[in-house]
Amino acid sequence: MLFIYMMSTGQLNSYIEHTALKPDLTIAEVQQLCNEAMQFHFAGVCVPVYFLNAAIEILNGTGVDIVTVIGFPYGYSSTISKFEEAEEALFRGADHLDVVINIAAVKNNDWETVENEIETLTKLVHAENKVIKLIAETGMMSDIELDLICKIANDSKVDYLKSSTGVNGPGANVETIAGIREMLSPDILIKASGGIRTRSLALELIEAGANRIGASKSVAMVTES
């Protein structure tokens, strides 16, 4: 617990990807999101592909990572569809692509599809020297499924495993983050996301192994007394 009290607000801010992914998102809200990211020195912003141009116009050259989502939020679109979506995101200038695992394929034990898709998308993203995060939707996965997902992530050499979309099932929790940290290779990082609304939870997740925090309540989190 000492770690929680030692981390400064500035240090916490450097972990946060300020996120807006709701379906009725407006351009004004994206602009506010980006301005807040600059004001509070957040690590990145996460927005839908549709809003990438708007985010890049504001944040280009600031050092704030531009993050978007692929196959969001259910992950069951085809690999070809995800590939084309990822290509567009890269063309528009995204730095990080957060890709939802094919949850339906996992639940039907179609691990060949899961593995082939992750490998294909990882090669595409890495060919452009960008970052891929695999959204594992941990709250919907059994221990066995999560173990297999971590093995595929290790073999495919994704950059991050991300805990949740924030849409399906429970969000991030300390126990799960600590567990996947043990299963992942040391060079694969973790993004905790989903239901993170307080500074204390964010710090506990970082202590458990999270390298980034995805949150929509970021400003309230870092300004709470």
Can you annotate each of these PLM segments?
Residues 1-6:
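Short, Lys/Arg-enriched N-terminal segments with co-localized hydrophobic residues
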Residues 9-40, 52-57, 64, 69, ...:
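Alpha/beta enzyme core
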Residues 43-51:
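N-terminal low-complexity or amphipathic/hydrophobic leaders
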Residues 74-81, 222-225:
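Short, charged, surface-exposed secondary-structure boundary motifs
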Residues 191-195:
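Short glycine/threonine-rich catalytic loop with a Thr-x-Gly-x-Asp
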